[in-house]
């Protein structure tokens, strides 16, 4: 018996729907395609973060300005470099970067570091002018950067390059003023260029024009005005201008060094030691403030300690002076010039034996235990700290800046010579080198030529006497040393040394 199948009263039998199947197939194929694209990186996840968070240019500029004011110039440079990376066609930012790079060179120690930073600043300044050839400030900052590149200490072996920088700096200054003759920065920077060209009257004229402008309340303007007054010998007027610049940029230590040097120069002119003492102490305050700021912002610069040492030397406090030179050597234990300065301090304090080690390191170089003796230590012992480590020092060639170390060294060697400890061989070699330098560069020694010759002749006479009869040189030690101390180590210059 056939029984008909039961009808589905409550449930429908499943049936295939061709449209639904097609949709599923398309979704599966689409998913496979999506996975392949994600794997190859052609499609990024919707909420995946960007590789580098995007920051607005204004954010970098604010960060750079804040670091500049705080004295963290390396961080300021980094911020401005990021700003020009985001917006490479912004001439204003390139110009600001160049200005900061230029000023940052004052916080660097070696000439090689300064040269590298200043050349980078020059590239930035040229880029700003390239992007905005009609912008007065861009040309002014290029002039400023060129002027700071024209540094005779950096290019001592290529003075023609210094002249080239100065000529171009003047051209850019004139271009800046041609674009806008009321630009305060352009007026100030041009005054600085004129000052370095020794056109002092014109420099004074243009800085006065800058000071008359309503926006003259700028560190750059006060700094240049102070430099002009300082060069003209008006030290008492230069100091308040440096103070105004310091008030705007309180972490720019080179401003403190200049102000302190002006106080020391004023003190040197005061004949009464009691009256001069407070002025010297004011000088020390500025130098010590510079050292403290450097410590706070992480700048390892020996300059403040050398400035403190010079001030104590002028006060006749040679023990304190020597301690500060030794502190400077902790920052730069291979700098031969600092060894020379320590040797001069020892010499002026009549520590003649100690001066020999330091001066020898300065002009002949030294290494091993001799390097520690040159720093005033008994011997090297790195276990006591890094300041007791051995170092290799390369001697300084004779030049107008180093000749003082040579003739003092020769003078001490000859004066301390004895029949059984004759140092005249080395002394006479030094004297020969000094004479050769005087002949080779007579223009550099116009003022001190005769004094240096007298010192050389006194030393040669000692050695000649010793060679003839073996008489001990101690009988003429006083003559040899008393004619020497002030030569080449005083601050009797138009622009005081920090």
Predicted regions and their residues:
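Canonical tetratricopeptide repeat
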Residues: 96, 141, 189, 223-224, ...
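Short coil turns that delineate tetratricopeptide repeat
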Residues: 88, 133, 181, 215-216, ...
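Residue-level recognition of tetratricopeptide repeat
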Residues: 65, 99, 103-106, 144, ...
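Alpha-helical segment of the N-proximal tetratricopeptide repeat
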Residues: 55-86, 106-114, 156-159, 268, ...
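Conserved structural position within tetratricopeptide repeats
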Residues: 82-85, 123-130, 171-178, 208-213, ...
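Start-of-helix register in tetratricopeptide repeats
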Residues: 58, 92, 137, 144, ...
């Amino acid at each position: 018996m056939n029984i008909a199948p039961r009808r589905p009263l409550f449930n429908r039998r499943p049936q295939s729907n061709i449209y639904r199947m097609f949709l599923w197939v398309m979704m599966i194929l689409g998913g496979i395609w999506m996975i392949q694209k994600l794997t190859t990186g052609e499609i990024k996840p919707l909420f995946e973060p960007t590789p580098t968070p995007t920051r607005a240019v204004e954010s970098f500029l604010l960060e750079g300005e804040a670091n500049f004011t705080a004295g963290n110039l390396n961080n300021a440079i980094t911020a401005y470099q990021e700003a020009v990376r985001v917006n490479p066609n912004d001439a204003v930012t390139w110009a600001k970067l160049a200005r900061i790079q230029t000023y940052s060179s004052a916080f660097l120690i070696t000439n090689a570091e300064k040269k590298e930073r200043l050349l980078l600043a020059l590239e930035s300044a040229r880029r700003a002018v390239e992007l905005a050839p009609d912008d007065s400030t861009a040309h002014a900052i290029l002039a400023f950067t060129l002027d700071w590149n024209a540094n005779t200490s950096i290019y001592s072996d290529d003075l023609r390059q210094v002249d080239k920088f100065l000529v171009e700096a003047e051209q850019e200054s004139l271009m800046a003023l041609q674009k806008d003759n009321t630009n305060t920065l352009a007026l100030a920077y041009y005054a600085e260029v004129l000052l370095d060209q020794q056109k002092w009257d014109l420099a004074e004229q243009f800085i006065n024009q800058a000071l008359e402008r309503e926006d003259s309340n700028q560190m750059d303007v006060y700094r240049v005005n102070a430099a002009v007054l300082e060069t003209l010998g008006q030290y008492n007027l230069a100091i308040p201008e440096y103070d105004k610049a310091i008030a705007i940029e309180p972490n720019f230590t080179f401003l403190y060094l200049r102000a302190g040097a002006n106080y020391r120069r004023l003190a040197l002119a005061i004949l009464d030691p009691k009256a001069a003492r407070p002025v010297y102490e004011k000088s020390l305050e500025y130098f010590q403030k510079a050292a403290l700021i450097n410590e706070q912002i992480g700048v390892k610069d020996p300059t403040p300690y050398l400035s403190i040492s010079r001030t104590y030397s002028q006060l006749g406090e040679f023990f304190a002076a020597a301690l500060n030179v030794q502190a400077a050597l902790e920052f730069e234990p291979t700098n031969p010039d600092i060894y020379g300065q320590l040797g001069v301090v020892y010499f002026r304090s009549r520590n003649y034996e100690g001066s020999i080690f330091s001066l020898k390191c300065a002009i002949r170089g030294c290494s091993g235990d001799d390097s520690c003796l040159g720093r005033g230590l008994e011997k090297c012992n790195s276990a006591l700290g890094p300041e007791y480590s051995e170092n290799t020092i390369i001697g300084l060639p004779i030049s107008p800046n180093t000749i003082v170390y040579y003739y003092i060294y020769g003078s001490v060697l000859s004066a301390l010579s004895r029949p059984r400890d004759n140092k005249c061989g080395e002394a006479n070699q030094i004297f020969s080198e000094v004479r050769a330098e005087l002949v080779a560069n007579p223009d550099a020694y116009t003022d001190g030529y005769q004094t240096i010759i007298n010192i050389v002749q006194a030393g040669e006479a000692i050695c000649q006497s010793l060679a003839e009869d073996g008489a001990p040189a101690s009988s003429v030690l006083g003559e040899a040393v008393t004619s020497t101390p002030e030569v080449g180590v005083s601050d009797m210059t138009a622009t005081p040394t920090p």
